[in-house]
C-alpha cells in the first residue's frame, strides 16, 4: 500500500469519528474517547493544530497524526491502524510531521501492562520513536489516574 497523507487545519465530523474509532481500537482502553463529544473536548483543548490523515487506496482513513502548540512548544500525537504497522508508513508520517518543524514533543506509554479494547496487550511504541530519531526524556513523566507515559523529544540536528 502506498498511503496518501493529507494535511489540513481542521477535521470534518466524519473524519473525527473515523479517527476516534482508530484511537479507541489502537490505544489502551483506559484512554478511549467514548463519545464523539469526548474526542471534540480533547481537540478543543489544543491550539494551532494541524492534522495529518493517512488514507489507503480505497480512500479510507487508516492513520492520523496531529501537531499542536502547548506552552509555545510543538507537540504531536499519532495513531495508525494496526494493519499499517511495520510497513514504514508510521516512519513516513513522522517524516512528514518533522518536515515543518525543528522540534517535536510527545507522550508515549512505556510499559506493557495496558490492554486495548479488544483485550490484546498494548505494545509500547517507544522503540519505534527511538528508531525514528526521538530521545526518551525518562525523568519527565505524565502520571494520571488513567495514563502513565514518558516524554519523547525530537530535535532537528
Model region roles, listed by residue range:
Residues 1-37:
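Short amphipathic alpha-helix that is part of the acyltransferase structural core
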Residues 28-52, 56:
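Active-site rim helix/loop that mediates acceptor-substrate recognition in acyltransferases
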Residues 53, 59-68, 74-79:
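Conserved beta-strand in the GNAT
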Residues 77-86, 110-113:
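A short, internal acetyl-CoA/4′-phosphopantetheine-binding micro-motif in the GNAT/acyltransferase core
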Residues 86-99, 122-124:
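Conserved acetyl-CoA-binding loop-helix of GNAT-fold acetyltransferases
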Residues 99-117:
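Conserved GNAT acetyl-CoA-binding A-motif
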Residues 111-138:
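Conserved active-site alpha-helix within GNAT-family acetyltransferase domains
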Residues 123-125, 141-149:
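Short glycine/proline-centered loop/turn elements that form peptide/ligand docking sites
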Amino acid at each position: 500500500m502506498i498511503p496518501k497523507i493529507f494535511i489540513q487545519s481542521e477535521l470534518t465530523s466524519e473524519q473525527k469519528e473515523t479517527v476516534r474509532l482508530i484511537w479507541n481500537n489502537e490505544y489502551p482502553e483506559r484512554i478511549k474517547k467514548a463519545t464523539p463529544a469526548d474526542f471534540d473536548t480533547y481537540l478543543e483543548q489544543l491550539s494551532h493544530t494541524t492534522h495529518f490523515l493517512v488514507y489507503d487506496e480505497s480512500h479510507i482513513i487508516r492513520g492520523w497524526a496531529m501537531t499542536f502548540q502547548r506552552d509555545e512548544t510543538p507537540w504531536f500525537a499519532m495513531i495508525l491502524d494496526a494493519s499499517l504497522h511495520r510497513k514504514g508508513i508510521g516512519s513516513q508520517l513522522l517524516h512528514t510531521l518533522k518536515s515543518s518543524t525543528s522540534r517535536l514533543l510527545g507522550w508515549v506509554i512505556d510499559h506493557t501492562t495496558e490492554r486495548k479494547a479488544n483485550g490484546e496487550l498494548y505494545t509500547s511504541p517507544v522503540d519505534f520513536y527511538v528508531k525514528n530519531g526521538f530521545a526518551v526524556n525518562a525523568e519527565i513523566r505524565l502520571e494520571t489516574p488513567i495514563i502513565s507515559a514518558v516524554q519523547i523529544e525530537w530535535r532537528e540536528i
